[in-house]
Amino acid sequence: MIWNAAEKISRKEMRELQLSRLRWQVEYAYSHVPFYKKKWDEIGLKPSHIERLSDISKIPFTVKTDLRDHYPTGLFAVPNREIVRFHSSSGTTGKPIVVGYTRNDMDNWTECCARMASAAGVTRDDIAQIAFGYGLFTGGFGLHYGLERVGASVLPISSGNSERQLMFMQDLKSTVLVATPSYVLHLTEIMEEKGIAKEDIFLKVGLFGGEGHTPEMREQIERRLGIDDTQNYGLTELCGPGVSYECLEHTGMHINEDMFIAEIIDPKTGEVLPEGSIGEIVYTTLTKEGIPMLRYRTKDITRIMYEPCACGRTNARMDLVMGRSDDMMVIRGVNVFPSQVESVLMGIDGIGQQYQLIVTTEKYMDRMEVQVELLDGAILESYSNLERLTAEIRHKIKTVLQIDVKVTLLNPKTLERTAGKSKRVIDKRLKAF
């Protein structure tokens, strides 16, 4: 089902709408956000210079460090009294990125997620079980309001407590599941251990995001649960989930082009690439009041497809993300940077400078092991000291990352040294891209 007429207007109409909204957004950002005004003034750029869509390439990029450097609200365009919701994502040095939504921003976010739900076939006859975390993470709330807008009944169970998830799934006859794909496969393992067959549940479709997943994972989810697996894409910096989404044709993720302009650039040079090219996707918001984002570099590698979809939607589609242009990892839906872990480790007495992160998949769930050298191997001879230090590291890392990790303490000079850049991460997971 097509929820909004904006999803099927002609390319000409969409470009005209985008240009009108782009002009408004750049004027708004320039006049309300000192960061943008200063940046533009330094290069002699004025909002009036944006006359055509192609002029967007004149606008300087915005990057994650810009938000971090202006923590918490330095890029906001409105005072806090006009913000009705704050969300945040983890930061690489302990400070998170904070975003704010005005009432209109919340309405547009809800609309984006309603389109996502509708594209997956969700209606007012469905019961949607949201197994995303609620809180500062945008995942749970975005889908919550979007699903309510299409009329679905929402079960905001949040993440974890798998036995409780399955109990409600059966008792309330949930038909839609919202979660990370790795958690879904974890649930199927528990179902099979308990003798719960797919015929014993009522799920028909999944709205999965927060991390990529392989075609093999999708095939397993669909086969073991008997559902249609749809993927979606979003970033906290833009709005959270709802930037783009799959329909039931599975031919790419439809971009909400009336809300965002997407470009593909060369991640090394920053030059805009021709249509059909694979590169880094860059997004510009078109309707944001709280914190407008102009040419935000996502670091995600993909391509954009412009031909109409068989579902009837004409908005452009982004391919599933093929990789990252930086060192960020996504573990159980959480953005993790090696520098976050390093920052924690370097602040603990007795810990050396050499460490390594081992990322694996166990029972379809991402796991991370932190291997770190000690300054003095004698600590390993004392069980109480070893246990205390291990617990301290685990606790401090969980405080920063919000995920549990395994910690292995090593003797000095255990890890391999190289003359070049140290290999901090060993990712043994099946590649999702």
Residue ranges and their predicted role:
Residues 127-130, 282, 371:
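Short, well-ordered beta-strand segments
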Residues 127, 194-213:
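Conserved helix-loop-beta element of the AMP-binding
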Residues 103-116, 127-186:
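AMP-binding/adenylate-forming
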Residues 177, 287-403, 420:
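AMP-binding/adenylate-forming catalytic core of the ANL superfamily
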Residues 29, 88-92, 128, 177, ...:
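Conserved S/T- and glycine-rich ATP-binding loop of Class I adenylate-forming
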Residues 183-202, 219-224:
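Adenylate-forming
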Residues 204, 213-308:
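Conserved AMP-binding/adenylate-forming
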Residues 1-88, 93-111, 115-119, 123-124, ...:
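Nucleotide 5′-phosphate-binding alpha/beta core
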